[in-house]
């Protein structure tokens, strides 16, 4: 204790001395920069004076060898501002030596060797390699710290950073100063957003303000030219977040071209592109998924030959890229033909050019190429071409040189004539023949030579001057001629020859006089001898098959004047043929009309003999077949026995009846067959039984058994075919109906059949029309040509007034055109599979027969007016501008019609245009003819929201029971149909709709709907069938699923056996009312035909649909689908086609009222009806009272016309 107090004062004195003594500094400043490794800090060493360390911090003071006191090393830590990037360390040492500075954090330690050359040194340490928000401690070996020896760098924000995407879902940000990295997920909410991200460090959170990338871009494009690329998932700003995507997005395609977004891009059509969107982000890019781009234009590439002559061709070329490629415009059109000299093309409009080829040679098949170049301002596109072959018309042969004919005399009255033979190209048409005519004051002499221009004329008149005319006629009847003269020489034996000639002439004259006397006597004794016509027939050339259409066009032009002239030039009655038997008083009651009587020479004579052998019927020749037909009047009650006697005696097995028993409240024919409920009728010795009766829409087939009680054991089968679709006035508007009737009749013929009995009412008009069509088709098949005029004249020589009115004469022409253009396309179910296999077969690159059949179909583009649907007020009501209903069959409904009643078409025609505008409402829907009756289907587009009320009103007024929907409301993002029903009752204007029940099946949904007008109490119940297997496809994958749904609709709606339901239209709708609707309507009618007749005719069905609405069954794939559906509906089992049983039971038909309400096709509203002649039906009493009076004109079939009032026939729709 005493020692401590003794040393205390000494220690205190030493401390005071150290504290008060000034710090020594060196008088010279030296800076030494020491650079370590890349991971070592940069050290700045300075010998500048530094503040003295507090004495209180000194530890371990000791004396050195010299006896002085040695002060231990001390250091102080000074952290400068971070912007200077340095750390100061003050070291006070007692001598120069090497020090080691240790900087440590929790994980690592850095050693920095430092040399001190003075007692006190300040060291700057740059800390780029240090991390922010991290605690560090600084220690120096063998030195004591003054103050704190730890520090941290609280740097909170980054100044510079980089970014690099990591896959599609992450991006990594790296601080360029501190080498800090953080990866974050890319989300939709953060796309293109400026946001801070934090890195959690030891003492604080380090923040980087970054620009987030977008989620992986997706690009879309419009399928059109020009197209536009769109960044479909581009982030959009919301209420809380502002998206700031940079305008650096480009689309790069395989042609190494970059395109901007939302700008017109002209790509080449039908070329495959691979396009990728690229978003520039920092020093890299973010790519979208590659998109395959291939834009197919719906090219319309049509050529129409507007004029073809013997030396020129004018063609209109319509080259339109379609609605999808409206951006393609043409810069110029051009054309070139082989072997031609001059061709010019004139641009008519943006898509059409008129090309004129002139100075051509006659009858040459030219191969030409049309070219169109796209406007270069929109890009480099290929040149579009269209090749065609066309032959120029024929002209007169090049045979007009007067020096061409050479005459060489061989004797005094003989010579040879030669001329230069024409080369093939000099005929200017098909090779023909040479004709030589010798002209003098005597009868001309004519010779033909089909091989060469060489003729020999012998035994000519002596001393006579002849003009020799050589005519070259090519195969198209064009002719040229050349002439020469030559005189025969005098004969030295002229006298002898003259005497001989005089004797011969005298003898011949005497014989001629005797012959004429004999003929005169014979004429007086035989009054029925045929004499020459006092009115010669007109010379009308036969028509070849290839010229039927052109002939029809020529004759129908100018309101059918040529048809009228031809028809009126044929005598109605050939008065040189007697009609004595028909005019006998005892036979007059047997005639239905007093002026339609059979000629005596070819009337059918019954075997009863005497006065009872008369019947109003005539044998008629067919095409090269005598007595092929019997043309008879419709039997009267008084002549039914005679009719059956004629059938029995002539062994006829087929009766064709082309009328109804009553038409227009007039009796046309007695019912001479038994009805099903009576089974048999007895007409004196004849017993007629009915075995079966088949009802079809246009005809009824009855299978009868005919017995003759006088001939035991005799029984014959007679087929009775009654055509019921001939309208009361005019003629059938569709000639294919008569072709179908002909096929039915011929299907029952056999080798042993007698004459076919054909009758209407008078047995002349409709009867003659049917016979003419049948015979002319045989002529067309045998000779490739028809002589309609000659055959009708021939018919009238056999029975008066055959083919009674001009409309029937025209109908014969249109029926032959129909047959020649389309042929026989009807197929029975028993042969369907074998025929279909044949149709599908292909021979190399040639199209199959099925494809050729489809190509025959007319397109009927704009063949009827569409004024209502195309008006400005109604354009907005159409989904598709290419599918607008025709005016003649559009569905008309009226807002002022109260209640659930359908509009009467006859009443509609009486409306004025003002009334129609005010009352009739427009909806895009068309009436479609069904198999059983007209207007039994309605094809409609999917209703828009703005037309939902009109759609429901149409259903309500048409009393529709069944509604077929073939689309979803939306498909592939496109609106196909507004959903006009809902879970709860919906109201649209005055109409309400409610779903009462929903049934879901694998392929369709059935909804039971109730529709009501707020103005009426009646509720309409409708079954809606929505087909589910058509979504996103051009055709259903399984055709049988559609067939099955149609069968279920037929069964549930009782359409198979209910005439009432057949007349109520079924409404079918898809997006535009044609693309899918047309297939369903065609299939519906074909199935009806198959079930009823065991026959189908796909071509005729599609042709009829195309005439009723645009866009129906437009592609070969849709056409083939119908065949595929029928193939599956009627499969082959055990080698035979499995046909469904006929669901239509035979019905008892009262002929006096049957089918009077059925709609009938007419030849058009603008065609006049044939005027009926002022005739009264004769009866027995009237005949007796007026047997000596002049008979009045006959009352015909409602089809007769007087000579003062001829009518025009039907208008043929011809597309070539």
Swiss-Prot record:
What is the gene name? ptprc
What's in the keyword line of the UniProt record? Cell membrane, Glycoprotein, Hydrolase, Membrane, Phosphoprotein, Protein phosphatase, Repeat, Signal, Transmembrane, Transmembrane helix
Transmembrane segment boundaries: 494-514
Q: State the function annotated in the UniProt record.
A: Protein tyrosine-protein phosphatase required for T-cell activation through the antigen receptor.
| Location in or out of the cell | Cell membrane
Q: Where is this region: Disordered?
A: 26-67, 899-919, 1154-1216
Q: Which domain of life is it from?
A: Eukaryota
GO-annotated molecular function: protein tyrosine phosphatase activity
The cross-references to Gene3D superfamilies, in alphabetical order and at most eight, read: Immunoglobulins, Protein tyrosine phosphatase superfamily
Q: Please list the residue ranges that the record marks as compositionally biased, kind Acidic residues.
A: 904-919
Record PROSITE patterns: FN3 (PS50853), TYR_PHOSPHATASE_1 (PS00383), TYR_PHOSPHATASE_2 (PS50056), TYR_PHOSPHATASE_PTP (PS50055)
Q: Which InterPro entries does this one have?
A: FN3_dom, FN3_sf, Ig-like_fold, Prot-tyrosine_phosphatase-like, Protein-Tyr_Phosphatase, PTP_cat, Ptprc, Tyr_Pase_AS
**Catalysed conversion reaction:** O-phospho-L-tyrosyl-[protein] + H2O = L-tyrosyl-[protein] + phosphate
> Which PANTHER family does the protein's record reference?
RECEPTOR-TYPE TYROSINE-PROTEIN PHOSPHATASE, RECEPTOR-TYPE TYROSINE-PROTEIN PHOSPHATASE C
Phosphoserine found at: 881, 903
Q: What is its EC number?
A: 3.1.3.48
Question: Where is substrate bound in this sequence?
Answer: 728, 760-766, 804
Domain Fibronectin type-III intervals: 71-165, 298-395, 401-491
Major localization listed first in the record, in broad terms: membrane
Q: What topology in the membrane does the UniProt record assign? A: Single-pass type I membrane protein
Provide the residues annotated with a glycan attachment (glycosylation). Answer: 64, 92, 98, 135, 160, 179, 185, 205, 240, 283, 301, 349, 365, 375, 393, 478
Gene Ontology CC: one annotated term: plasma membrane
Q: Where is composition skewed (Polar residues) in this entry?
A: 26-49, 1154-1165, 1204-1216
Show which residues sit on the Cytoplasmic side of the membrane: 515-1216
Report the source organism.
Answer: Cyprinus carpio (Common carp)
Q: What is this protein called?
A: Receptor-type tyrosine-protein phosphatase C
Q: Which residues form the active site?
A: 760 (phosphocysteine intermediate), 1070 (phosphocysteine intermediate)
Q: Where is the Tyrosine-protein phosphatase domain?
A: 563-819, 850-1129
């Amino acid at each position: 204790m005493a020692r401590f107090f003794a040393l205390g004062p000494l220690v205190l004195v030493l401390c005071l001395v150290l504290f008060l003594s000034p710090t020594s500094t060196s008088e010279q400043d030296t800076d030494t920069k020491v650079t370590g490794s890349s991971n070592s800090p940069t050290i700045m060493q300075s010998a500048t004076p530094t503040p003295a360390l507090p004495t209180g911090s000194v530890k371990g003071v000791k004396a050195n060898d010299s006896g002085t006191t040695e002060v231990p090393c001390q250091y102080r830590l000074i952290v400068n501002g971070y912007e200077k990037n340095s750390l100061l360390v003050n070291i006070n040492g007692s001598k120069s030596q090497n020090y080691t500075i240790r900087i440590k954090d929790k994980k690592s330690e850095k050693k920095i060797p430092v040399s001190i050359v003075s007692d006190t040194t300040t060291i700057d340490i740059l800390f780029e390699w240090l991390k922010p928000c991290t605690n560090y401690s600084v220690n120096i070996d063998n030195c004591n710290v003054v103050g704190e020896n730890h520090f941290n760098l609280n740097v909170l924000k980054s100044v510079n950073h980089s970014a690099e995407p990591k896959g599609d879902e992450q991006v990594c940000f790296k601080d360029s100063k501190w080498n800090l990295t953080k990866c974050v997920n890319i989300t939709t909410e953060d796309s293109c957003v400026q946001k801070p991200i934090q890195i959690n460090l030891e003492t604080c959170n380090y923040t980087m303000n970054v620009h987030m990338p977008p989620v992986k871009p997706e690009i879309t494009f419009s399928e059109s030219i020009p197209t536009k690329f769109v960044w479909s998932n581009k982030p959009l700003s919301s209420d809380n977040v502002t998206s700031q995507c940079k305008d650096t997005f480009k689309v790069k395609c395989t042609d190494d071209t970059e395109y901007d977004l939302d700008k017109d891009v002209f790509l080449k059509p039908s070329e495959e592109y691979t396009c990728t969107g690229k978003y520039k982000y920092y020093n890299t890019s973010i790519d979208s998924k590659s998109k395959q781009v291939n834009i197919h234009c719906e090219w319309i590439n049509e050529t129409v030959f507007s004029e073809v002559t013997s030396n020129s061709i004018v063609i209109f070329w319509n080259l339109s890229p379609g609605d999808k490629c409206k951006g393609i415009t043409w810069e110029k059109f051009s054309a070139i033909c082989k072997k031609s000299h001059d061709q010019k093309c004139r641009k008519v409009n943006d898509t059409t050019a008129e090309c004129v080829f002139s100075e051509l040679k006659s009858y040459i098949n030219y191969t030409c190429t049309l070219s169109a170049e796209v406007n270069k301002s929109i890009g480099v596109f290929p040149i579009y071409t269209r090749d065609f072959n066309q032959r120029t018309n024929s002209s007169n042969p090049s045979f007009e040189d007067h020096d061409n004919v050479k005459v060489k005399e061989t004797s005094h009255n003989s010579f040879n004539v030669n001329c230069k033979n024409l080369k093939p190209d000099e005929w200017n048409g098909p090779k023909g023949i040479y004709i030589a005519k010798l002209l003098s004051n005597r009868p001309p002499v004519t010779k033909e030579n089909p091989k060469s221009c060489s003729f020999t004329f012998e035994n000519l008149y002596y001393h006579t001057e002849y003009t020799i005319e050589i005519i070259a006629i090519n195969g198209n009847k064009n002719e040229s001629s050349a002439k020469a003269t030559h005189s025969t020489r005098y004969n030295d034996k002229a006298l002898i020859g003259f005497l001989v000639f005089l004797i011969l002439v005298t003898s011949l004259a005497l014989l001629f006089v005797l012959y004429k006397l004999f003929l005169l006597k014979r004429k007086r004794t035989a009054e029925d001898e045929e004499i020459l016509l006092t009115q010669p027939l007109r010379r009308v050339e036969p028509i070849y098959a290839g010229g039927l259409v052109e002939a029809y066009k020529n004759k129908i032009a100018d309101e059918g004047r040529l048809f009228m002239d031809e028809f009126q030039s044929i005598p109605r009655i050939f008065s040189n043929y007697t009609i004595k038997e028909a005019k006998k008083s005892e036979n007059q009651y047997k005639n239905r009309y007093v002026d339609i009587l059979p000629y005596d020479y070819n009337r059918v004579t019954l075997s009863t003999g005497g006065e009872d052998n008369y019947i109003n019927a005539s044998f008629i020749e067919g095409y090269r077949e005598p007595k092929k037909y019997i043309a008879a009047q419709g039997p009267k009650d008084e002549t039914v026995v005679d009719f059956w006697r004629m059938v029995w005696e002539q062994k006829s097995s087929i009766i064709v009846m082309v009328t109804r028993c009553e038409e227009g409240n007039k009796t046309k024919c007695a019912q001479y067959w038994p009805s099903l409920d009576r089974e048999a009728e007895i007409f004196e010795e004849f017993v007629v039984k009915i075995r079966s009766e088949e009802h079809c829409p246009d005809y009824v087939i009855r299978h009868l058994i005919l017995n003759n009680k006088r001939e035991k054991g005799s029984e014959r089968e007679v087929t009775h075919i009654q055509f019921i679709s001939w309208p009361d006035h005019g003629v059938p508007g569709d000639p294919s109906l008569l072709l179908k009737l002909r096929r039915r009749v011929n299907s029952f013929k056999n080798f042993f059949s007698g004459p076919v009995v054909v009758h209407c009412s008078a047995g002349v008009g409709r009867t003659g029309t049917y016979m003419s069509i049948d015979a002319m088709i045989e002529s067309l098949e045998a000779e490739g040509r028809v002589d309609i005029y000659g055959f009708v004249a021939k018919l009238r020589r056999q029975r008066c007034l055959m083919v009674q009115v001009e409309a029937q004469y025209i109908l014969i022409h249109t029926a032959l055109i129909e047959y020649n253009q389309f042929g026989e396309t009807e197929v029975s179910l028993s042969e369907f599979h074998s025929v279909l296999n044949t149709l599908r077969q292909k021979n190399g690159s040639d199209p199959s027969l099925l494809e050729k059949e489809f190509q025959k179909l007319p397109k009927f583009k704009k063949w009827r007016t569409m004024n209502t649907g195309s008006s400005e007020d109604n354009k907005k009501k159409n989904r598709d501008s290419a599918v607008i209903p025709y005016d003649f069959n559009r569905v008309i409904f009226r807002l002022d019609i109260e209640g659930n009643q359908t509009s009467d078409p006859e009443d509609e025609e009486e409306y004025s245009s003002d009334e129609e505008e005010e009352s009739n409402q427009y909806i895009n829907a068309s009436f479609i003819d069904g198999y059983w009756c007209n207007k039994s289907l309605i094809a409609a587009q999917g209703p828009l929201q703005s037309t939902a009320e009109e759609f429901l009103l149409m259903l309500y007024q048409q009393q529709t029971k069944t509604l077929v929907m073939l689309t979803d409301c939306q498909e592939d993002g496109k609106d196909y149909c507004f959903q006009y029903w809902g879970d709860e009752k919906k109201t649209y204007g005055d109409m309400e709709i409610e779903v009462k029940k929903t049934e879901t099946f694998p392929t369709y949904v059935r909804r039971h709907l109730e529709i009501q007008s707020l103005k009426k109490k009646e509720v309409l119940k409708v079954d809606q069938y929505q087909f589910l297997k058509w979504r996103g496809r051009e055709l259903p994958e399984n055709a049988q699923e559609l067939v099955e749904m149609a069968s279920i609709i037929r069964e549930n709606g009782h359409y198979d056996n209910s005439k009432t339901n057949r007349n109520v239209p079924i409404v079918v709708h898809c997006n535009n009312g044609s693309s899918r609707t047309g297939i369903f309507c065609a299939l519906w009618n074909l199935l009806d035909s198959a079930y009823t007749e065991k026959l189908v005719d796909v071509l005729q069905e599609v042709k009829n649909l195309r005439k009723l609405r645009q866009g129906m069954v437009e592609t070969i794939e849709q056409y083939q689908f119908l065949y595929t559906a029928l193939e599956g509906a009627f499969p082959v089992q055990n080698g035979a086609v499995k046909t469904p049983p006929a669901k239509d039971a035979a019905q008892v038909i009262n002929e006096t009222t049957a089918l009077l309400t059925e709609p009938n096709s007419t030849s058009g509203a603008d065609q006049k009806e044939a005027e009926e002649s002022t005739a009264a039906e004769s009866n027995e009493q009237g005949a007796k009272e007026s047997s000596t009076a002049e008979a009045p004109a006959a009352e015909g079939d409602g089809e007769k016309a007087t000579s003062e009032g001829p009518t025009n026939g039907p208008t043929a729709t011809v597309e070539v």
